[in-house]
Amino acid sequence: MDWPVSVALAQSVPELPTGTDWNYEMKLDGHRMIMWRTDDGVRLQARSGRDVTAAWGDLALAGHHLPAGTVLDGEAVITTEDGRISFEAAQARAASSPTRAHRLATQCPAHYIAFDALQLPSGDVRPRPYSERRAALLSLLAGLPATTPIQAVSATTDRDTALTWYNTLHNKHGVEGIVAKRATSSYRAGRTGAWQKIRHAETVDADVIGYTGPLTRPRALAVRLPNGRTSLTQTLSAPLAAQIAQVLVAAGPAEKGSTDTSEAYTKIPSGLATVEVLAGTTRHAVVTPLRLR
């Protein structure tokens, strides 16, 4: 398997599928991450393919307990003192310099919630059905130290249990949704019907086509939405602005552009970055950005 690997994605659906061929997993509000345990050490990959090892050194260290040749798919999460998953804390960590990330890891350690095995020391397991990959993942993680921050995502074959999680764990614990996965499905990159999700806040991905403000501290982004409309986002949070600034250094010479409503911005090449935005805001004059993909 070659770095970076393309990840499987879930389709948004209005309700969870029914039937005996489905498994249901908690969807946690963190940062999607592929954990690579190689002969040389551990590398951590973002969904976009970026190397994010430096920001998550505590998880990279924990990954050394995995056998070489292991590749896992999962979510990096950080919890607050009251036990709630904090996307803001994960965002701050992801945007930090290595020095600050190390300090934040000491204050608020991260957990890696694994939900799939892509490769084991025996080889690529993506063609195998989900039920077999899940069993292999649980067996693998059972051999890690008791104090490891690497854990398997909670899952059930009972739809009613999954709906109870969805309805009761959002406000208290930060569970943002449920992902249903067909037990017989292989791991396929992209968005397929084999993975389906419901979540409390629906989102879409938007192509970043520019920014406003200084290159080193962008104030807002210009994005192209799935319907083709171009728009500015709301003001970026400090962590998201810092993350975007790291990407913009590769943007090249600056040119001016304007949105469909004639709002000026500085252009960047299409395809350089993608952000997740709240779906409910895509009809508004400005959209709400959540995270860098």
Which residues fall in each region the model found?
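Catalytic cores of nucleic-acid ligases and guanylyltransferases
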Residues: 1-293
